[in-house]
Amino acid sequence: MASLSSQSKLLATPYSFPYHTKPSRVSLRRVSCKASNDNKDKPNDQEKTFSIDRRNMLIGLGGLYGASNVFPSNQSTLAAPIQPPVLPDSCHPPEDLAEGVNVLCCPPDVKDPIDFQMPSNPSRLRIRPAAHLADPTYIEKYKKALAAMKALPQNDPRSFYQQANIHCAYCNGAYDQVGFPDVNIQVHHSWLFLPFHRWYLYFYERILGSLIDDPTFAIPFWNWDAPKGMHMPHMFIDPNSPLYDAKRNPAHFPDTIVDLDFSSGEAPSHNPRQIGNNLSIMYKQVVRAKKARLFHGRPLQAGSFPDESGDGSLEGTPHGNIHLWSGDPRQSNFENMGNFYSAGRDPLFYAHHANVDRMWYIWKNSLGRKDYKKKDWLNAGFLLFDENAQPVRVYVRDALDERKLGYAYQEVDIPWINSKPKPRKANPWPNRLRSKATTTTKLINKFPLTLDSTVSFEVKRPKKSRSKSEKEDEEEVLVIEKIKHEPQFPLKFDVYINDEDEDPSAADQTEFAGSFVNVPHFHRHGDKKDKRQTTNLSIGISEVLDELDVDGDDSIVVTLVPRVGSGQITIGGAKIEFVRDEED
């Protein structure tokens, strides 16, 4: 192995990620669903054909998911878990990339894959430290490990080049789903988000430790959810360090406070309430996400396009906002952190996602929440490379307990758990009759709509005045449906409930319920005629309605405010759902 000093000299120049010519590829046309309300329950002939073809294909995946397991009586189509891709056949250059971006994300074809074996109970856990609390000895160790990773040949699956490409491949349509050559694997915008990234960081960490012969080495987490960690960690900003990346927003270097509600294009925040706003956002996105579907995201099964799912609460905000806050606005596609194809090229990415992973730990252990129990989630799988350059098939079921994987997080304060937002006004819009008599807000009543200005609309509530036990059993959820947009652009709109003032409520106020955030990415579309992505936004609102004292109302007024990409988003509708812990 080269010495640390020689590696540091090697890394003084930017790490190279060459571009490649993108070959053409034929893709089958996606069967799209009817968008209008009149036809929502009437599949057309193409949809029926797709349902039959998908059913036959799933039966062909094997006896493990035979008809008795994947033909629920209340579903018209089969379900089965996403399977690990098969190399090299399942991988190809990403499609629908932005002009001038031609990348090759596929890993080298080196060995036959093996199934992951859970390690025996470790005698000593790897402890991931908060980045801002790391001591100089640890920082030097991390620099040495990453320098060694960057010094590996680019065709080595353990190299930083190949590790960065993992995110590119899984997040930009480079992998086909097993059995569905016209449907890509996408690990964002669904229940795959948290377990995939946990596995990704697990092997990244193991490789780093092996390169410095230290099995106890653990990567740091960017503690952006606590006041003293709400800035880009200093260990990542030395231009002469392997932890540095030149493609970041220079206006956001320390000690600029991170904005967890960041809208792309905004100037650095100097809001004296910024820290309080950040803590309130963390409360909304983690504490209020009481059910697995809200926290993890909607299901995604084999044969389904990612368009048919939806983000969990953590993925949009703060995860997406931090990607955009860190990315370089001087780059055409907000590289590196600001675009999924390039995010893994920045060492800051792994510290960011370590804290995202930590949120999963907190959600389960500090808040007592429950993961999905669906087999299609537990048996979903991915293909990654271990510290021996061995391709390994891994499954969600083995990633549920980080301690069994041999690591834990440094214990630090979690101030946002008690940072509940407060209403701007007591009992706003107390009932439908009074709201109509007192507000000057014009309510729209026609969908779909193009979100090119602030809009408000009424959403009926199927149930009201529920008991405490009913609310604990079922979370009331506001669903913004059929959000259509082009995924290669940064986008954001905010959602407010019963916010009657012309100026929207602040992030630390109850009326501000949440946001839709899109980090630029590229993925294959089944329908080549429509390049837009379709998704859904789900927000738990039981606690919000209690705090606003409107749980007895027949309806709520929802206001959408475009922040980034005005006019580039179409909204298909909105409704109220009730979500339980288990959705088998």
UniProtKB/Swiss-Prot annotation:
There is a cross-link at C171-H188 (2'-(S-cysteinyl)-histidine (Cys-His)). The keyword 4Fe-4S does not apply. GO terms for molecular function: catechol oxidase activity; metal ion binding. The keyword Plastid applies. InterPro entries: Di-copper_centre_dom_sf, Polyphenol_oxidase, Polyphenol_oxidase_C, Polyphenol_oxidase_cen, Tyrosinase/Hemocyanin, Tyrosinase_Cu-bd. Cu cation A binds at H167, H188, H197. It holds the Pfam family Tyrosinase. Its cofactor is Cu(2+). Its EC number is 1.14.99.47. Residues 432-584 form a propeptide. Residues 1-32, 33-79 form a transit peptide. Binds 2 copper ions per subunit. It comes from the Eukaryota. It catalyses: (+)-larreatricin + AH2 + O2 = (+)-3'-hydroxylarreatricin + A + H2O. PROSITE patterns: TYROSINASE_1, TYROSINASE_2. It is found in: Plastid, Chloroplast thylakoid lumen. Cu cation B binds at H319, H323, H353. Keywords: Chloroplast, Copper, Disulfide bond, Metal-binding, Oxidoreductase, Plastid, Thioether bond, Thylakoid, Transit peptide. Belongs to the tyrosinase family. Enantio-specific polyphenol oxidase involved in aromatic ring hydroxylation. Involved in the biosynthesis of the creosote bush 8-8' linked lignans. Has a strong preference for the 3' position of (+)-larreatricin. This is (+)-larreatricin hydroxylase, chloroplastic.
